[in-house]
Amino acid sequence: MKRFTRREIAKTIGVAGAAGAVAGMPLPAAFGQAPALKPRAFPTNFLWGCATSAYQIEGAVAADGRGPSNWDIFAHTPGKTHQGETGDVAADSYHLYKDDVKLLKELGAKAYRFSLSWSRIFPEGRGKPNAAGLAYYQRLIDELLNSGIEPYVTLFHWDLPQALEGGWQSRETPKAFGDYAAYAARKLSDRVRHFMTTNELVCFTDLSYQIGQFAPGLKLAAAQVNQIRHHGLLAHGLGVQAIRANSLSGTQVGLAENPKVYVPLIESGEHIEAAKLAFREENAPFLTAVMEGKYTDGYLKREGANAPKVQGDDLKIIGSPLNFVGLNVYQPEYARADSGESGYALARRPASFPHMASPWLFIGPEVIYWAIRHTNDLWNPRAIYITENGCSCEDFRDADGRIEDTDRVMFLRNYLTHLQRAAAEGYPIKGYFLWSLVDNFEWADGYSKRFGIHYVDFKTRERTRKLSADWYRELIARNAVA
Protein backbone atom coordinates (compact mmCIF):
# COMPACT_ATOMS: atom_id res chain seq x y z
CA MET A 1 0.00 0.00 0.00
CA LYS A 2 1.33 3.44 -0.90
CA ARG A 3 2.87 5.58 1.84
CA PHE A 4 2.43 9.31 1.28
CA THR A 5 5.29 11.78 1.43
CA ARG A 6 4.85 14.88 3.57
CA ARG A 7 4.49 16.95 0.40
CA GLU A 8 1.64 14.70 -0.78
CA ILE A 9 0.07 14.91 2.66
CA ALA A 10 0.26 18.69 2.50
CA LYS A 11 -1.68 18.63 -0.77
CA THR A 12 -4.29 16.31 0.73
CA ILE A 13 -4.97 18.07 4.01
CA GLY A 14 -4.60 21.65 2.92
CA VAL A 15 -2.66 24.64 4.19
CA ALA A 16 -3.42 24.29 7.91
CA GLY A 17 -2.57 20.60 8.02
CA ALA A 18 0.48 21.06 5.85
CA ALA A 19 1.83 23.77 8.12
CA GLY A 20 1.60 21.45 11.08
CA ALA A 21 3.37 18.65 9.25
CA VAL A 22 6.13 20.85 7.92
CA ALA A 23 6.66 22.36 11.36
CA GLY A 24 7.45 18.90 12.69
CA MET A 25 4.16 18.26 14.45
CA PRO A 26 3.62 14.51 14.82
CA LEU A 27 1.58 13.02 12.02
CA PRO A 28 -1.58 11.08 12.87
CA ALA A 29 -0.95 7.37 13.17
CA ALA A 30 -3.39 6.65 10.35
CA PHE A 31 -1.61 8.73 7.70
CA GLY A 32 -0.73 6.69 4.62
CA GLN A 33 -3.26 3.95 5.36
CA ALA A 34 -5.82 4.96 2.72
CA PRO A 35 -5.93 6.59 -0.72
CA ALA A 36 -6.19 10.36 -0.87
CA LEU A 37 -9.72 11.76 -0.97
CA LYS A 38 -11.02 14.76 -2.82
CA PRO A 39 -11.87 17.73 -0.59
CA ARG A 40 -15.12 17.16 1.36
CA ALA A 41 -15.50 13.63 -0.06
CA PHE A 42 -15.78 10.34 1.81
CA PRO A 43 -14.43 6.91 0.86
CA THR A 44 -16.32 4.79 -1.63
CA ASN A 45 -18.87 2.58 0.15
CA PHE A 46 -18.92 4.83 3.22
CA LEU A 47 -22.09 3.87 5.09
CA TRP A 48 -24.67 6.61 5.70
CA GLY A 49 -27.61 5.97 8.00
CA CYS A 50 -29.88 7.20 10.78
CA ALA A 51 -30.44 6.01 14.34
CA THR A 52 -33.32 5.68 16.81
CA SER A 53 -34.13 3.69 19.94
CA ALA A 54 -37.10 1.54 20.93
CA TYR A 55 -38.61 3.41 23.88
CA GLN A 56 -38.10 6.77 22.21
CA ILE A 57 -40.10 6.01 19.06
CA GLU A 58 -42.09 2.77 19.25
CA GLY A 59 -44.97 3.51 21.61
CA ALA A 60 -47.38 0.56 21.88
CA VAL A 61 -46.11 -0.12 25.38
CA ALA A 62 -48.82 -2.69 26.15
CA ALA A 63 -49.24 -4.17 22.67
CA ASP A 64 -48.78 -7.83 21.78
CA GLY A 65 -47.53 -9.02 25.14
CA ARG A 66 -44.83 -6.44 25.83
CA GLY A 67 -43.92 -6.23 29.50
CA PRO A 68 -43.31 -2.95 31.36
CA SER A 69 -39.83 -1.44 31.39
CA ASN A 70 -38.17 0.73 34.01
CA TRP A 71 -38.84 3.73 31.78
CA ASP A 72 -42.57 3.01 31.70
CA ILE A 73 -42.60 3.21 35.49
CA PHE A 74 -40.24 6.19 35.71
CA ALA A 75 -42.02 8.30 33.09
CA HIS A 76 -45.35 7.77 34.85
CA THR A 77 -43.89 8.95 38.16
CA PRO A 78 -44.91 12.60 38.76
CA GLY A 79 -42.10 15.10 38.36
CA LYS A 80 -39.67 12.82 36.52
CA THR A 81 -40.19 14.01 32.95
CA HIS A 82 -41.08 17.27 31.23
CA GLN A 83 -44.78 17.93 31.90
CA GLY A 84 -45.24 14.28 32.85
CA GLU A 85 -44.77 13.13 29.26
CA THR A 86 -44.22 9.43 28.55
CA GLY A 87 -43.23 7.08 25.76
CA ASP A 88 -46.65 5.39 25.75
CA VAL A 89 -47.23 6.41 22.12
CA ALA A 90 -44.09 8.39 21.20
CA ALA A 91 -43.76 8.47 17.39
CA ASP A 92 -45.90 5.29 17.18
CA SER A 93 -43.25 3.56 15.09
CA TYR A 94 -44.55 0.18 16.25
CA HIS A 95 -47.46 0.79 13.91
CA LEU A 96 -45.80 3.23 11.49
CA TYR A 97 -42.50 1.44 10.91
CA LYS A 98 -43.17 1.18 7.18
CA ASP A 99 -43.48 4.96 7.03
CA ASP A 100 -40.12 5.28 8.78
CA VAL A 101 -38.46 2.87 6.37
CA LYS A 102 -39.90 4.90 3.51
CA LEU A 103 -38.26 8.02 4.98
CA LEU A 104 -34.93 6.21 5.10
CA LYS A 105 -35.31 5.10 1.50
CA GLU A 106 -36.13 8.65 0.39
CA LEU A 107 -32.92 9.83 2.05
CA GLY A 108 -30.90 7.24 0.21
CA ALA A 109 -29.73 5.84 3.55
CA LYS A 110 -28.01 2.48 3.36
CA ALA A 111 -28.28 1.58 7.06
CA TYR A 112 -30.61 2.00 10.02
CA ARG A 113 -29.52 1.66 13.61
CA PHE A 114 -32.37 0.85 15.99
CA SER A 115 -32.73 -0.93 19.31
CA LEU A 116 -34.81 -3.86 20.45
CA SER A 117 -37.12 -3.49 23.41
CA TRP A 118 -35.89 -6.17 25.81
CA SER A 119 -39.26 -6.27 27.56
CA ARG A 120 -41.07 -6.67 24.24
CA ILE A 121 -39.13 -9.87 23.58
CA PHE A 122 -38.84 -11.06 27.21
CA PRO A 123 -41.71 -9.49 29.19
CA GLU A 124 -40.26 -10.89 32.44
CA GLY A 125 -36.68 -10.07 31.47
CA ARG A 126 -35.79 -13.74 31.03
CA GLY A 127 -37.56 -17.07 30.75
CA LYS A 128 -40.26 -17.50 28.12
CA PRO A 129 -39.85 -15.28 25.04
CA ASN A 130 -42.75 -13.37 23.51
CA ALA A 131 -43.16 -14.52 19.91
CA ALA A 132 -45.29 -11.52 18.96
CA GLY A 133 -42.63 -9.11 20.17
CA LEU A 134 -39.92 -10.83 18.17
CA ALA A 135 -42.19 -10.90 15.11
CA TYR A 136 -42.40 -7.10 15.11
CA TYR A 137 -38.64 -6.82 14.72
CA GLN A 138 -38.60 -9.50 12.06
CA ARG A 139 -41.16 -7.49 10.07
CA LEU A 140 -39.14 -4.30 10.51
CA ILE A 141 -35.90 -5.99 9.45
CA ASP A 142 -37.55 -7.56 6.41
CA GLU A 143 -38.95 -4.17 5.40
CA LEU A 144 -35.48 -2.66 5.68
CA LEU A 145 -33.79 -5.40 3.68
CA ASN A 146 -36.45 -5.25 0.98
CA SER A 147 -35.68 -1.52 0.71
CA GLY A 148 -31.93 -2.07 0.41
CA ILE A 149 -31.21 -0.83 3.94
CA GLU A 150 -28.87 -2.69 6.30
CA PRO A 151 -30.11 -3.18 9.90
CA TYR A 152 -27.70 -2.35 12.73
CA VAL A 153 -29.28 -3.67 15.92
CA THR A 154 -28.64 -2.43 19.45
CA LEU A 155 -29.78 -4.85 22.14
CA PHE A 156 -30.07 -2.44 25.05
CA HIS A 157 -30.82 1.29 24.91
CA TRP A 158 -31.77 1.96 28.56
CA ASP A 159 -35.25 0.37 28.72
CA LEU A 160 -34.72 -2.45 31.23
CA PRO A 161 -37.52 -4.94 31.93
CA GLN A 162 -39.12 -3.85 35.18
CA ALA A 163 -39.44 -7.49 36.22
CA LEU A 164 -35.67 -7.79 36.71
CA GLU A 165 -35.56 -7.22 40.45
CA GLY A 166 -32.73 -4.97 41.52
CA GLY A 167 -31.98 -3.76 38.01
CA TRP A 168 -28.31 -3.04 37.41
CA GLN A 169 -27.58 -3.31 41.12
CA SER A 170 -27.94 -7.08 40.73
CA ARG A 171 -25.30 -9.33 39.21
CA GLU A 172 -28.18 -11.43 37.87
CA THR A 173 -29.08 -8.71 35.37
CA PRO A 174 -25.91 -9.15 33.27
CA LYS A 175 -26.61 -12.89 33.19
CA ALA A 176 -30.17 -12.23 32.01
CA PHE A 177 -28.79 -9.89 29.36
CA GLY A 178 -26.50 -12.65 28.11
CA ASP A 179 -29.49 -14.98 27.74
CA TYR A 180 -31.44 -12.28 25.89
CA ALA A 181 -28.48 -11.58 23.58
CA ALA A 182 -28.14 -15.28 22.78
CA TYR A 183 -31.83 -15.53 21.84
CA ALA A 184 -31.72 -12.38 19.69
CA ALA A 185 -28.65 -13.67 17.86
CA ARG A 186 -30.23 -17.06 17.21
CA LYS A 187 -33.42 -15.55 15.87
CA LEU A 188 -32.09 -12.55 13.94
CA SER A 189 -28.54 -13.24 12.74
CA ASP A 190 -29.89 -14.81 9.57
CA ARG A 191 -30.75 -11.27 8.46
CA VAL A 192 -28.78 -8.98 10.83
CA ARG A 193 -25.02 -8.81 10.34
CA HIS A 194 -24.20 -6.09 12.89
CA PHE A 195 -25.15 -6.17 16.56
CA MET A 196 -24.34 -3.70 19.33
CA THR A 197 -24.65 -4.84 22.92
CA THR A 198 -25.30 -1.70 24.95
CA ASN A 199 -25.76 2.00 24.33
CA GLU A 200 -23.96 4.59 26.47
CA LEU A 201 -22.98 2.84 29.68
CA VAL A 202 -22.70 6.08 31.65
CA CYS A 203 -26.34 6.96 30.97
CA PHE A 204 -27.90 3.78 32.34
CA THR A 205 -25.46 3.68 35.28
CA ASP A 206 -24.37 7.12 36.52
CA LEU A 207 -27.36 9.14 35.28
CA SER A 208 -29.74 6.47 36.54
CA TYR A 209 -28.21 5.39 39.85
CA GLN A 210 -25.98 8.28 40.93
CA ILE A 211 -27.53 11.50 39.61
CA GLY A 212 -31.08 10.15 39.49
CA GLN A 213 -32.02 11.92 36.26
CA PHE A 214 -32.95 8.72 34.41
CA ALA A 215 -34.81 5.55 35.36
CA PRO A 216 -34.92 4.28 38.07
CA GLY A 217 -33.99 7.70 39.48
CA LEU A 218 -31.75 6.65 42.38
CA LYS A 219 -28.91 8.52 44.08
CA LEU A 220 -26.59 5.89 45.49
CA ALA A 221 -23.16 6.01 47.11
CA ALA A 222 -19.94 5.78 45.10
CA ALA A 223 -19.21 2.13 45.92
CA GLN A 224 -22.69 1.09 44.77
CA VAL A 225 -22.42 3.13 41.58
CA ASN A 226 -19.03 1.63 40.73
CA GLN A 227 -20.47 -1.86 41.16
CA ILE A 228 -23.40 -0.93 38.91
CA ARG A 229 -20.93 0.29 36.29
CA HIS A 230 -19.14 -3.05 36.57
CA HIS A 231 -22.41 -4.92 36.05
CA GLY A 232 -23.08 -2.85 32.93
CA LEU A 233 -19.64 -3.72 31.58
CA LEU A 234 -20.17 -7.37 32.44
CA ALA A 235 -23.48 -7.37 30.56
CA HIS A 236 -21.71 -6.00 27.51
CA GLY A 237 -19.03 -8.70 27.68
CA LEU A 238 -21.51 -11.51 28.24
CA GLY A 239 -23.53 -10.12 25.35
CA VAL A 240 -20.52 -10.20 23.03
CA GLN A 241 -19.83 -13.82 23.94
CA ALA A 242 -23.48 -14.82 23.58
CA ILE A 243 -23.80 -13.22 20.15
CA ARG A 244 -20.64 -14.90 18.91
CA ALA A 245 -21.74 -18.30 20.22
CA ASN A 246 -25.26 -18.13 18.81
CA SER A 247 -25.08 -16.24 15.51
CA LEU A 248 -24.27 -17.20 11.98
CA SER A 249 -20.71 -16.93 10.73
CA GLY A 250 -19.73 -13.42 9.71
CA THR A 251 -21.79 -11.59 12.33
CA GLN A 252 -20.09 -8.40 13.51
CA VAL A 253 -20.27 -7.37 17.17
CA GLY A 254 -19.58 -4.03 18.84
CA LEU A 255 -21.12 -1.50 21.19
CA ALA A 256 -22.23 2.13 21.05
CA GLU A 257 -20.42 4.22 23.61
CA ASN A 258 -20.33 7.95 24.38
CA PRO A 259 -16.91 8.59 25.86
CA LYS A 260 -15.82 11.97 27.10
CA VAL A 261 -13.77 13.25 24.20
CA TYR A 262 -10.88 15.59 24.96
CA VAL A 263 -9.86 18.03 22.27
CA PRO A 264 -6.33 19.44 22.61
CA LEU A 265 -6.53 23.15 23.38
CA ILE A 266 -3.68 23.66 20.93
CA GLU A 267 -3.06 21.21 18.12
CA SER A 268 0.58 20.56 18.94
CA GLY A 269 2.43 17.44 19.99
CA GLU A 270 2.38 17.86 23.77
CA HIS A 271 -1.26 18.93 23.93
CA ILE A 272 -2.37 16.14 21.57
CA GLU A 273 -0.64 13.61 23.79
CA ALA A 274 -2.26 15.16 26.88
CA ALA A 275 -5.72 14.97 25.31
CA LYS A 276 -5.14 11.30 24.46
CA LEU A 277 -4.04 10.56 28.04
CA ALA A 278 -7.17 12.31 29.31
CA PHE A 279 -9.37 10.33 26.92
CA ARG A 280 -8.01 7.04 28.25
CA GLU A 281 -8.07 7.90 31.94
CA GLU A 282 -11.32 9.86 32.15
CA ASN A 283 -13.15 6.99 30.42
CA ALA A 284 -11.54 4.36 32.65
CA PRO A 285 -14.83 2.96 34.08
CA PHE A 286 -16.35 2.50 30.63
CA LEU A 287 -14.75 2.44 27.17
CA THR A 288 -11.19 2.02 28.42
CA ALA A 289 -12.21 -1.03 30.47
CA VAL A 290 -13.94 -2.53 27.43
CA MET A 291 -10.99 -1.97 25.11
CA GLU A 292 -8.27 -3.05 27.55
CA GLY A 293 -10.05 -5.66 29.67
CA LYS A 294 -8.90 -4.00 32.87
CA TYR A 295 -9.38 -0.96 35.07
CA THR A 296 -6.57 1.58 34.92
CA ASP A 297 -4.30 1.97 37.93
CA GLY A 298 -5.36 5.60 38.16
CA TYR A 299 -9.04 4.71 38.37
CA LEU A 300 -8.49 2.07 41.04
CA LYS A 301 -6.32 4.48 43.03
CA ARG A 302 -8.91 7.27 42.83
CA GLU A 303 -11.77 5.02 43.90
CA GLY A 304 -9.85 3.20 46.62
CA ALA A 305 -12.23 1.24 48.85
CA ASN A 306 -15.11 2.23 46.53
CA ALA A 307 -13.61 0.39 43.54
CA PRO A 308 -15.80 -2.32 42.01
CA LYS A 309 -15.56 -5.87 43.29
CA VAL A 310 -14.30 -8.07 40.46
CA GLN A 311 -14.97 -11.81 40.35
CA GLY A 312 -13.22 -14.60 38.43
CA ASP A 313 -12.97 -13.92 34.71
CA ASP A 314 -15.01 -10.70 34.80
CA LEU A 315 -12.32 -8.54 33.21
CA LYS A 316 -11.57 -11.09 30.50
CA ILE A 317 -15.28 -11.19 29.67
CA ILE A 318 -15.53 -7.39 29.69
CA GLY A 319 -12.58 -7.18 27.30
CA SER A 320 -13.99 -9.65 24.78
CA PRO A 321 -12.64 -8.68 21.33
CA LEU A 322 -14.89 -6.55 19.13
CA ASN A 323 -15.33 -6.30 15.38
CA PHE A 324 -16.04 -2.58 15.60
CA VAL A 325 -16.40 0.31 18.02
CA GLY A 326 -19.41 2.63 17.84
CA LEU A 327 -18.91 6.19 19.08
CA ASN A 328 -21.80 8.48 19.99
CA VAL A 329 -20.35 11.98 19.64
CA TYR A 330 -22.00 15.24 20.58
CA GLN A 331 -20.03 17.69 22.70
CA PRO A 332 -16.34 18.38 23.36
CA GLU A 333 -14.24 18.48 26.47
CA TYR A 334 -10.84 20.17 26.39
CA ALA A 335 -7.42 19.23 27.75
CA ARG A 336 -3.91 20.64 27.73
CA ALA A 337 -0.48 19.41 28.72
CA ASP A 338 0.43 19.68 32.39
CA SER A 339 3.52 18.91 34.44
CA GLY A 340 1.52 17.05 37.10
CA GLU A 341 1.46 13.30 37.61
CA SER A 342 -1.36 12.67 35.12
CA GLY A 343 0.32 14.61 32.32
CA TYR A 344 -2.83 16.56 31.49
CA ALA A 345 -5.14 19.24 32.84
CA LEU A 346 -8.80 19.67 31.99
CA ALA A 347 -10.11 23.03 30.81
CA ARG A 348 -13.48 24.32 31.93
CA ARG A 349 -15.95 25.78 29.46
CA PRO A 350 -16.84 29.43 30.09
CA ALA A 351 -20.47 30.42 30.61
CA SER A 352 -20.53 31.92 27.11
CA PHE A 353 -19.68 28.62 25.39
CA PRO A 354 -22.27 28.04 22.60
CA HIS A 355 -24.77 25.20 22.81
CA MET A 356 -27.81 23.91 20.96
CA ALA A 357 -31.38 23.77 22.32
CA SER A 358 -30.35 21.19 24.92
CA PRO A 359 -28.20 23.08 27.45
CA TRP A 360 -25.77 20.17 27.72
CA LEU A 361 -25.13 20.00 23.97
CA PHE A 362 -22.13 22.30 23.61
CA ILE A 363 -20.93 22.89 20.07
CA GLY A 364 -17.43 21.76 19.14
CA PRO A 365 -17.30 20.18 15.67
CA GLU A 366 -13.67 19.04 16.00
CA VAL A 367 -14.74 16.60 18.73
CA ILE A 368 -15.82 14.05 16.14
CA TYR A 369 -12.32 13.94 14.65
CA TRP A 370 -10.64 13.56 18.03
CA ALA A 371 -13.05 10.84 19.15
CA ILE A 372 -11.96 8.76 16.17
CA ARG A 373 -8.28 9.63 16.39
CA HIS A 374 -7.92 8.94 20.13
CA THR A 375 -9.80 5.65 19.83
CA ASN A 376 -7.63 4.53 16.95
CA ASP A 377 -4.32 5.67 18.42
CA LEU A 378 -4.98 4.03 21.79
CA TRP A 379 -6.56 0.74 20.75
CA ASN A 380 -6.34 0.31 16.97
CA PRO A 381 -9.84 -1.15 16.46
CA ARG A 382 -10.68 -2.93 13.23
CA ALA A 383 -13.46 -0.49 12.39
CA ILE A 384 -15.10 2.61 13.87
CA TYR A 385 -18.62 3.91 13.28
CA ILE A 386 -20.15 7.15 14.47
CA THR A 387 -23.27 5.52 15.89
CA GLU A 388 -24.88 8.79 16.97
CA ASN A 389 -24.37 12.45 16.14
CA GLY A 390 -26.95 15.18 15.85
CA CYS A 391 -28.55 17.99 17.80
CA SER A 392 -31.71 19.40 19.32
CA CYS A 393 -33.19 22.56 17.78
CA GLU A 394 -36.19 24.81 18.34
CA ASP A 395 -37.97 23.56 15.24
CA PHE A 396 -41.13 25.26 14.02
CA ARG A 397 -43.28 25.40 10.91
CA ASP A 398 -43.16 28.61 8.89
CA ALA A 399 -46.18 30.14 7.17
CA ASP A 400 -45.81 27.69 4.29
CA GLY A 401 -45.61 24.68 6.60
CA ARG A 402 -41.88 24.18 6.10
CA ILE A 403 -39.39 23.43 8.87
CA GLU A 404 -36.20 25.24 7.95
CA ASP A 405 -33.82 24.05 10.65
CA THR A 406 -30.82 25.98 9.39
CA ASP A 407 -29.17 25.67 12.80
CA ARG A 408 -29.20 21.86 12.54
CA VAL A 409 -27.75 22.03 9.03
CA MET A 410 -25.01 24.31 10.36
CA PHE A 411 -24.26 21.87 13.16
CA LEU A 412 -24.16 18.82 10.92
CA ARG A 413 -22.14 20.45 8.15
CA ASN A 414 -19.45 21.53 10.60
CA TYR A 415 -19.26 18.20 12.43
CA LEU A 416 -19.17 16.22 9.20
CA THR A 417 -16.38 18.40 7.86
CA HIS A 418 -14.27 17.14 10.76
CA LEU A 419 -15.50 13.59 10.17
CA GLN A 420 -14.22 13.92 6.62
CA ARG A 421 -10.84 14.97 7.98
CA ALA A 422 -10.64 11.68 9.89
CA ALA A 423 -11.53 9.75 6.75
CA ALA A 424 -9.00 11.69 4.66
CA GLU A 425 -6.26 10.95 7.17
CA GLY A 426 -6.89 7.23 6.85
CA TYR A 427 -8.62 6.37 10.10
CA PRO A 428 -10.84 3.25 9.92
CA ILE A 429 -14.11 5.15 10.00
CA LYS A 430 -16.68 3.07 8.13
CA GLY A 431 -20.00 4.83 8.59
CA TYR A 432 -22.13 7.49 10.23
CA PHE A 433 -25.58 7.31 11.84
CA LEU A 434 -27.37 10.62 12.23
CA TRP A 435 -29.40 11.07 15.40
CA SER A 436 -32.20 11.04 14.70
CA LEU A 437 -34.45 9.89 11.89
CA VAL A 438 -37.56 11.35 13.53
CA ASP A 439 -38.41 13.51 16.52
CA ASN A 440 -38.88 11.31 19.56
CA PHE A 441 -39.37 11.02 23.30
CA GLU A 442 -36.21 12.62 24.64
CA TRP A 443 -36.13 10.86 28.04
CA ALA A 444 -36.47 13.27 30.97
CA ASP A 445 -36.98 16.14 28.49
CA GLY A 446 -40.10 14.46 27.15
CA TYR A 447 -41.13 15.98 23.82
CA SER A 448 -39.61 19.40 24.53
CA LYS A 449 -36.39 18.69 22.61
CA ARG A 450 -36.47 17.70 18.96
CA PHE A 451 -33.50 15.81 17.47
CA GLY A 452 -35.11 14.44 14.31
CA ILE A 453 -34.51 15.43 10.70
CA HIS A 454 -38.20 14.63 10.22
CA TYR A 455 -40.73 16.58 12.25
CA VAL A 456 -43.31 14.55 14.17
CA ASP A 457 -46.66 16.07 15.10
CA PHE A 458 -47.18 14.29 18.42
CA LYS A 459 -50.95 14.71 18.16
CA THR A 460 -51.33 13.07 14.75
CA ARG A 461 -47.92 11.30 14.45
CA GLU A 462 -47.60 12.78 10.97
CA ARG A 463 -44.00 13.02 9.72
CA THR A 464 -42.78 16.09 7.82
CA ARG A 465 -39.40 16.44 6.17
CA LYS A 466 -37.18 19.20 7.59
CA LEU A 467 -34.57 21.18 5.67
CA SER A 468 -31.92 19.01 7.36
CA ALA A 469 -33.41 15.90 5.73
CA ASP A 470 -33.03 17.52 2.30
CA TRP A 471 -29.45 18.46 3.19
CA TYR A 472 -28.61 14.95 4.39
CA ARG A 473 -30.15 13.40 1.28
CA GLU A 474 -27.90 15.60 -0.86
CA LEU A 475 -24.84 14.67 1.21
CA ILE A 476 -25.59 10.96 0.80
CA ALA A 477 -26.08 11.35 -2.95
CA ARG A 478 -22.74 13.15 -3.31
CA ASN A 479 -20.92 11.07 -0.68
CA ALA A 480 -19.43 14.42 0.29
CA VAL A 481 -20.18 17.28 2.67
CA ALA A 482 -22.94 19.34 1.07
Task: Give each language-model segment a name.
Residues K2-R3, L361:
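A structural signal for short, well-ordered beta-strand elements
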Residues I13, G108, G148:
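Conserved functional loop/turn residues at catalytic and ligand-binding sites
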Residues G59-Y137:
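Active-site-adjacent substrate/metal-binding segments within catalytic domains
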Residues P35-P78, E124-G125, L134-A482:
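Active-site region of glycoside hydrolase catalytic domains
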